[in-house]
Structures are given as structure tokens and as C-alpha cells.
Amino acid sequence: MTRISRSAYAEIYGPTVVGGVGDRVRLADTLLLAEVEKDHTIFGEEVKFGGGKVIRDGMGQSQRLATDCVDTVITNALIIDAVTGIVKADIGIKDGLISGIGKAGNPDTQPGVTIIIGASTEVVAGEGLIVTAGAIDTHIHFICPQQIEEALATGTTTMIGGGTGPATGSLATTSTSGPWHMAAMLQALDAFPVNVGLFGKGSSSSHGALLEQVRAGAMGLKIHEDWASTPASIDTCLNVAEETDIQVAIHSDTLNESGFVEDTFAAFKGRTIHSFHTEGAGGGHAPDIIRAAGMPNVLPASTNPTMPFTRNTIDEHLDMVMVCHHLDPSIAEDLAFAESRIRRETIAAEDILHDLGAFSIMSSDSQAMGRVGEIVLRTWQTAHKMKLQRGPLQGDSERSDNERIKRYIAKYTINPAVAHGIAHLVGSVEVGKLADLVLWKPAFFGVKVNMVLKSGMAVSASIGDMGASISTPQPVQIRPMWGSHGKALRTSVAFVSQVSLSNPAVSELELNKRLEAVRGCRGVTKHDMVRNNWLPAISVDPQTYQVYADGQLLRCEALAELPMAQRYFLF
């Protein structure tokens, strides 16, 4: 038997597992090391495309018809996923869905083939690359359409939120108000290669005013203090959600005008709700909205400007609050409102609560106190910071960080999908789900994508000079691909409510995107948050703002330097 060294094998086919010991891959320039847990490959039967390689007719490529073969195969990829784990495999894609995770090839010449390659199969070389599920951002202010190109370039394939453009209401709140705006925005978003979902305005104590937005195509409702986050509006909104099986997101009452945090919790009546920026700098009862992260019916999220806690975090937030919420720095009350939201102690505690799995979701808050292109990046910066300051998680070691890696990737993939009733289609690298996949070079993981697939078709990729003789000459830039154009936009989905599918006005919009109803939103609890379901008793000292979880003080220092930062963005 011919043998090659482990390092030579990794160079050719990517990392593997030998003798129960997995190769390790560093994520970007962080301290995080991913160790391969399983390899579906049969040594000596690997498939690879190219001159003199295996995927040729009669070798790794079969003579079977398209019905038996995958449309696309990603070969020898390292999957990093909260559900599937950290595994090496070939990935088969058929009719826009992940059809297989296993061993690709020609079953007529090779053993153990679970993914059949034929003349109808395209190949994406995954050797040496990491594959993840596309990120799901549940806090999008749809202010400008250029956000979508930025989001795709950093691995986001599903954008959920609200807005109508740079209108004053949309600059502050993630809601698309009323049936007319709902229809117009669904039609506008039909031109972009991302999955979308819109929140209606949930700040109303009128049952009918909320229901008509859900019937118009809202996949959820958003309660926001700038429109009113009162106990009456919360109760009414949750009543409508219970009737129509949609999710409710909340930005609660910073000023405690209509009640304190206990009154808001009482208005929930044990019903499920998605709490935005649960730390509070992005908005919510001052100073103790962070207590919501310990409630079983609350699905707690962060927005990315507070993540992780650095020496610049506090300083940049004051101006963000003033601009976002239409405040006037010359008015003392407006300034006091902004300052009440920014607390060093709760921001520091947020990092630790993420690391322990009490915070379940990461999102952006795009252009409204958040950066649409940094949801993935800031998640991994936080994981790095916590390893640096707190050491390995339980189940990890100095050798690898698999448990921490799987916990953190869940925050922007499977958990937002579960929270909003779309996990049957997106959120993980699993058979049967949309092939919304992101390929990364390990050195650029979480920073700059290599390629983004929507339903198996490339929509964004790092590509060189389009006038050059090959695809790699500089400048290499992340650019839209064919899947971003024409009727290929049907590879994306518009998520709506189930009741809207029977509304003739919605079908008359004649969208290219296929409409998919959200489902199972009302039965979700914190226990369903994958790898992020810790329920501590959280308290906040009203004088010092110090945060305690199960009686333990949560404290960490701000970092002065982060990975995934300047060295990647000088050019």
C-alpha cells in the first residue's frame, strides 16, 4: 500500500482524522482551534477534480443520468456546524437542497459512495476550505439596498427585519408598517439573492391593526419603544402571534415610562418572545433588561456593536444612540436618555453570558446601531476574547476549542432559524435544507468569504480582475456572481406568515422568490436554543450596575486589541 505523510495528505485533500486524532485548523488569526471530529472519506478513494485527477468519466464520475446524480458536489470540505459538528465530508446538492453529506464518487468503481457524481454534476473544490451554513441576521433595518451586497460578502444569506428605506421610522425601528409598505418592500427585496422576512409594526393595542399586517405577509411583529412598548401593546401583539404562529421581537422601554422590567415580563404571560439587544445598550429597560436572558420564554439576542467589550465600545455608543433615535444633544433629557443605555458593567457581563450559553443569538442592527457586515466577525472575536480571558470551556482543552466553536456558530445559524420558525429550511448544514453555504479559506474565516452559495448557486465570491486571462490576478474583490441576476433569484425565499398565503393580495405580488410560511414559532422556548440554553437567575445592582448570574459576579476587562481586525482591512 502506498503511503503519504499526514502533512502531504492535508495539502492535497484537507485535514482528516487518523487513529482517532483529528487535524486542527486555526480560525483566522484567533486563538480558536477546530479539530476534525470525523472524516467520511475512505482513504485512497477520495475524489478531486482537475487534470490527472479522479473526477473523470469511468473513474470518479459515473455514466448515470441526472436523476441519479447530484447537481453540485463540494469535495473534501471541512464542515463547521452546530448540529452536524466539525466533520470532513463531501457535500451533495440536488434541486437547491443539501442531498448528501458523506462520500462522493462513482458507485460502479468505488466503495462506500453515498453521493453520485455524473456528467450533470458541477464540482466546487472544498479541499482546504471550511464550509458553514449561511448566517441568519434577525435584526435588519432595511435602510439601503447596498446592505445586501455587504451582508453576502461576509456570509449572511438570510436577512430578517423591517423598514422602508431611510425614513426616520426605519432608521430607528425594524418594522415595515402596514400592508402597503409590506407589499412594496416584498417586491423590492425580490431583486436580491438573499432569503428575506419582514416584521410588521407590533406597537399597537389594536388587534385588527396588527392582524392586517400579518395577513399582508409579515413573518413576525416587532415591538419598539419608539412606537410604544407598553404592557397593552405587548399583550395585544402576543395575542395576535399566538393566533397566527409568528414570532414577536421586542425592544423594551428604556425609560421605564409605562412600567419597569417586571411589568414587561408580566405582560409576556409566559409566552415566547425574541428579546433584541438584551444587554440594553441597544435599548431596553435600564438598567436591568439583561435579566430577560434567564427566562425560559425569552429568546435572548445581542446586537454586534457591544460585542465584544473593548476599550472603544463605550465611547462610540453615545453618538450612535443620539443619531439612531432622533435625539438632540442640546436637550438635556435626550442626552440623559442616551446615557442611561450605556453601562460598562452590563456590556462586560454580556460577553460572559454569551460564553456560558445564556445569550443565544447574535444579530447586527444594521445601520441603526449595528454593522451588517460584522455579525460573523464579531461573534468570533467574542469567542477569542473569552478563550483569552476565561480559558477553555468545559469539554474543551488546550488542544482544541470544538465546544466553544459549536456554541458560537449556533448563535448566528441554527438558533435564529429556530426562533423564527425557519429551521426546517435554513440554519445548519443538514440533508434536506437549502444549500445556503459559505466557503472560507481558514486564514480568512469569518472575515472575507471565498464563495457564497444560495440553493447551491454561487451568488458572491472572491474573484480577480475580470479582464485578466485567469480568475486570480489582483485586485481580488468579493463580487456578485450569476446567482445574483435574472430569474436565478428564485433560489431565494421570502418567509411570510401562514395566514398570508391564503391572501390573494400576496399572491398578486408575483414574486420571483418562492413564499415559505414560518412554522412552530409559538412552541419554541429557551430550551430549544442549540448549545445556548443556560437559564441562570440574573440580577443587576441598581446602584453599581454589576451583574450577577446565580449569585456569581460577572466581570471581564475590555480588550485593547482584537484579531480579525486591522491586518485584514488595510487594503
Curated annotation (Swiss-Prot):
Its EC number is 3.5.1.5. Binds 2 nickel ions per subunit. GO terms for cellular component: cytoplasm. PROSITE patterns: UREASE_1, UREASE_2, UREASE_3. Residues 134-571 form the Urease domain. One of its GO terms (molecular function) is nickel cation binding. The active site is at residue 325. Its cofactor is Ni cation. Pathway: Nitrogen metabolism; urea degradation; CO(2) and NH(3) from urea (urease route): step 1/1. Its main location: cytoplasm. It is found in: Cytoplasm. It catalyses: urea + 2 H2O + H(+) = hydrogencarbonate + 2 NH4(+). InterPro entries: Amidohydro-rel, Metal-dep_hydrolase_composite, Metal_Hydrolase, Urease_alpha_N_dom, Urease_alpha_subunit, Urease_AS, Urease_asu, Urease_asu_c. GO terms for biological process: urea catabolic process. The modification N6-carboxylysine is found at residue 222. NCBIfam families: PRK13207.1 (NF009686), urease_alph (TIGR01792). PANTHER family: UREASE. Heterotrimer of UreA (gamma), UreB (beta) and UreC (alpha) subunits. Three heterotrimers associate to form the active enzyme. Belongs to the metallo-dependent hydrolases superfamily. Urease alpha subunit family. This is Urease subunit alpha. It comes from Bordetella parapertussis (strain 12822 / ATCC BAA-587 / NCTC 13253).
